[in-house]
UniProtKB/Swiss-Prot annotation:
Belongs to the NqrDE/RnfAE family. The complex is composed of six subunits: RnfA, RnfB, RnfC, RnfD, RnfE and RnfG. It comes from Vibrio campbellii (strain ATCC BAA-1116). Keywords: Cell inner membrane, Cell membrane, Electron transport, Membrane, Translocase, Transmembrane, Transmembrane helix, Transport. It holds the Pfam family Rnf-Nqr. One of its GO terms (biological process) is electron transport chain. Its EC number is 7.-.-.-. GO terms for cellular component: plasma membrane. The lineage of its organism: Bacteria, Pseudomonadati, Pseudomonadota, Gammaproteobacteria, Vibrionales. It is found in: Cell inner membrane. Part of a membrane-bound complex that couples electron transfer with translocation of ions across the membrane. This is Ion-translocating oxidoreductase complex subunit A. It is a multi-pass membrane protein.
């Protein structure tokens, strides 16, 4: 049980996929201008990342390895992620049309979010079992959502602040992301 908690804390805080592994930077910068959009994207990505990790583990364990076709891993994982994202898009469209409109193009772009494919591939490379795959995918998703929501709330506050002209826009966003990354580095010694 302790190793599961350490895996969860490690993926959320210590080895955050956005701030440490630099995966998922496109939605991190693109969807983080408004807090409500960031929350919606975080929830959708949490669902997709967790489900894609589970599906990728199952495809790897019960299709690719038994047939000896591990070289098709990346292509099969992209197909799995595309199916999971389409399912998520249908669910969001039915349950929350407002959120569906707010997320716009970013919802189908979860398919090309490198964090989703990265988590699936790292899951397999680290030889996680089924439970660890679920925890790893969920922890990565919670870490992504946490960083996205924190960054969106900071960007909203910065938008209301008097920022010097040369630092407005992407410049101050990159500086803020760098400072967030430094703050998350404080968790480095928490989990080995």
């Amino acid at each position: 049980m302790t190793e599961y908690i350490l895996l969860l804390v490690g993926t959320v805080l210590v080895n955050n996929f956005v701030l440490v592994k630099f995966l998922g930077l496109c939605p991190f910068m693109g969807v983080s201008k408004k807090l409500e959009t960031a929350i919606g994207m975080g929830l959708a990505t949490t669902f997709v990342l967790t489900l894609a990790s589970v599906c990728a583990y199952l495809v790897e364990s019960y299709v690719l390895r038994p047939l000896g076709i591990e070289y098709l891993r990346t292509m099969s994982f992209i197909l799995v992620i595309a199916v999971v994202v389409q399912f998520t898009e249908m669910v969001v469209h039915k349950t929350s049309p407002t959120l569906y409109r707010l997320l716009g193009i970013f919802l189908p772009l979860i398919t090309t979010n490198c964090a989703v494919l990265g988590v699936a591939l790292l899951n397999i490379n680290e030889n996680h079992n089924f439970i660890e795959s679920i925890i790893y995918g969920f922890g990565a998703a919670v870490g992504f959502s946490l960083v996205l929501i924190l960054f969106a709330s900071m960007r909203e506050r910065i938008a209301a602040a008097d920022v010097p002209v040369p630092f407005r826009g992407a410049s101050i966003a990159m500086i803020t992301a760098g400072l967030m990354s430094l703050a998350f580095m404080g968790f480095t010694g928490l989990v080995k």
